[in-house]
UniProtKB/Swiss-Prot annotation:
Disulfide bonds: none annotated. The lineage of its organism: Eukaryota, Metazoa, Chordata, Craniata, Vertebrata. Substrate-recognition component of the SCF (SKP1-CUL1-F-box protein)-type E3 ubiquitin ligase complex. May play a role in accumulation of expanded polyglutamine (polyQ) protein huntingtin (HTT). It is found in: Nucleus. The F-box is necessary for the interaction with SKP1. Keywords: Actin-binding, Nucleus, Ubl conjugation pathway. Residues 1-83 are annotated as: Interaction with beta-actin. Part of a SCF (SKP1-cullin-F-box) protein ligase complex consisting of FBXO25, SKP1, CUL1 and RBX1. Interacts directly with SKP1 and CUL1. Interacts (via C-terminus) with beta-actin (via N-terminus). This is F-box only protein 25. InterPro entries: F-box-like_dom_sf, FBX25/32.
Length: 357
């Protein structure tokens, strides 16, 4: 399928339809196909082993090369996809670039489907999907919405398989189901892409995922070291590594020793100081009967009023020089003299704000 590229002077791209949507074919496969088409123009008949004896050595060699190219093309044509891990964020039309970049286009181009397999990017993608579910779901195109739910399906199946991060996905599905209920009940008040029955099916799918996660049973490891075998100081060190209070509470329910360590006032004080400032402490100060600060209660009280710091292993970055959004590990073709000075980390909320016009 021919498609006009980003530059109006380009010859255009070749695309192929797959399960994840339309994917652009690699440039070298197009050149190979072009060579084969040129060969077809000069020879309109099919050569077989019996006919080759009639032709000269030059024609025999040409026919042999042609068959090898045809065989190579058939073996590799389904694998020669090209996907850039960056996208140019333009907000206005120019002679070279028509239109502007949308949230849905960026969502499709940045390959979030592969990012969820990277443990460093998993939490980042989940948080982004959650923010989209809360406020930006209807702004996505039909293809982007389909891609959104395909990625979500892969995330749910991954969690059901490896039993990691179920709480994050439960929170995401809860927000998504609430949004879908509001959209379905208020049909006609907002513009929905697709038939209303599609949205009802999506809600039913989300409810089914929630039920599957609710029935998820953690398998106990029979062999090897467990948390109970570790010394107390190491268990305390593990708790101090957490940046989420709910993770500390959940881990404290495993053993009596961890329960005692999870109530450490110094632990919750460090957590409050990491996420919040002194002015916020003064506004929501909670004291015990003895006059001590209840840091654990303060953390959950402050969490209701202020956003906590977000921490991710790998995030998207924005290049101010090139106006390109990209994964830090993947990089992009930057033309700046000092590229590192032009890079800015992009939080999930900042990612969405980039496409608000």
């Amino acid at each position: 399928m021919p498609f006009l590229g980003q530059d109006w002077r380009s010859p255009g791209w070749s695309w192929m339809k797959t399960e994840d949507g339309w994917k652009r074919c690699d440039a070298w496969s197009q050149e190979l196909e072009g060579e084969n088409s040129q060969c077809d123009i000069g020879h309109g008949i099919i050569l077989n082993s019996e006919d080759e004896e009639i032709f000269s050595n030059e024609e025999h060699e040409f026919a042999s090369k042609k068959r090898k190219k045809d065989h190579f093309r058939n073996d590799t044509n389904t694998q020669c996809f090209y996907r850039e891990n960056w996208i140019y964020v333009h907000k206005e039309s120019t002679r070279e670039r028509h239109g502007y970049c949308t949230l849905g286009e960026a969502f499709n181009r940045l390959d979030f489907s592969s990012a969820i397999q990277d443990i460093r990017r998993f939490n980042y993608v989940v948080r982004l999907l959650q923010l989209i579910a809360k406020s930006q779901l209807t702004s996505l195109s039909g293809v982007a919405q389909k891609n959104y739910f395909n990625i979500l399906d892969k995330i749910v199946q991954k969690v059901l398989g490896d039993h990691q991060n179920p709480r994050l996905i439960k929170d995401l599905l809860q927000d998504l189901s609430s949004t879908l209920c509001i959209l379905i009940r208020g049909v006609g008040k907002s513009v929905l892409v697709g038939n209303i029955n599609i949205w009802i099916c999506r809600l039913e799918t989300v409810l089914r995922w929630q039920q599957q996660l609710q029935n998820l049973q953690m398998t106990e490891v029979d062999s090897g070291l467990t948390l109970s075998d570790l010394p107390v100081h190491m268990l305390s060190n593990i708790l101090y590594r957490f940046s989420d209070g709910w993770d500390i509470v959940t881990l404290g329910q495993v053993t009596p020793t961890l329960s005692a360590l999870s109530e450490d006032r110094q632990l919750w004080k460090k957590l409050c100081q990491y996420h919040f400032g002194e002015k916020q402490f003064c506004r929501h100060l909670i004291l015990s009967e003895k006059g001590h600060v209840e840091w654990k209660l303060m953390y959950f009280a402050l969490q209701k009023h202020y956003p906590t710091k977000e921490q991710y292993g790998d995030t998207l970055h924005f290049c101010r020089h090139c106006s390109i959004l990209f994964w830090k590990d993947s990089g992009h073709p930057c033309t700046a003299a000092d590229p590192d000075s032009c890079f800015t980390p992009v939080s999930p909320q900042h990612f969405i704000d980039l496409f608000k016009y």
